[in-house]
């Protein structure tokens, strides 16, 4: 069997890191590490958002939540500032770790830096890779987390969150989001947000 490519070496190492997540999720009758499942959902959406995505975008999308459990949201103050600081720190950590994994697998420092930038979602308006990461993250949120999340958040705040999420998505991601299967309650929130946005 030929040696693995840098891409496959990096993906294998990233998935090994994902698999270390102690949190579990039940999926199709199997118990999986939560982060490995999340990474799989991100990659699955990428195939629908971007036609023939390149290796660097695939690595960025796969790593967006890398080792997120190691820095819990509860370690930061409540409220918007605490949330934004936590999210920024998570993106920085995930980008740095992914860059190290990539270089160890044989990628150049410039390719590793480009992926780290995509993970931090820098330049959404000018970097298609960063936009792909954002699109996949928004779609995974709407598909897998929104129904439960919507029960924990005050209605008007939830409407604003949906509007902000929608505003960050590309036209293709919005099209895919409208095709999602949702509960009646979740669908009503999305429709209200879009009609009043």
Predicted segments with their positions:
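Divalent metal-dependent phosphate-bond-processing catalytic cores, especially two-metal-ion Mg2+/Mn2+ enzymes
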Residues: 2-9, 16, 29-36, 40, ...
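Generic structural signal for well-ordered, non-membrane alpha-helices
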Residues: 12, 96, 100, 140-141
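A ubiquitous short alpha-helical element
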Residues: 26-30, 80-87, 127-128
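Short, well-structured alpha-helical segments
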Residues: 43, 58-59, 112-120, 191
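His-Asp-centered metal-binding catalytic motifs of divalent-metal-dependent phosphohydrolases/nucleases
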Residues: 55-78, 94, 98, 117-123, ...
């Amino acid at each position: 069997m030929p040696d693995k490519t840098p891409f496959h070496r990096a993906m294998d190492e990233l998935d090994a890191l994902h698999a270390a997540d102690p949190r579990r999720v039940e999926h199709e009758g199997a118990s999986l590490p939560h982060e490995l499942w999340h990474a799989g959902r991100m990659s699955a959406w990428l195939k629908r958002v971007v036609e023939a995505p390149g290796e660097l975008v695939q690595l960025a999308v796969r790593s967006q939540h890398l080792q997120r459990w190691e820095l819990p949201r509860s370690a930061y103050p409540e409220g918007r500032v605490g949330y934004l600081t936590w999210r920024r720190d998570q993106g920085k950590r995930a980008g740095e770790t992914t860059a190290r994994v990539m270089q160890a697998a044989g990628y150049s420092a410039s390719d590793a830096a480009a992926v780290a930038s995509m993970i931090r979602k820098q330049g959404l308006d000018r970097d298609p890779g960063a936009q792909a990461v954002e699109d996949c993250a928004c779609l995974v949120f709407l598909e897998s987390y929104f129904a439960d999340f919507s029960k924990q958040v005050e209605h008007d705040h939830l409407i604003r969150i949906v509007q902000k999420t929608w505003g960050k998505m590309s036209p293709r991601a919005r099209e895919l989001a409208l095709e999602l299967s949702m509960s009646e309650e979740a669908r009503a929130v999305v429709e209200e947000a879009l009609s009043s946005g």
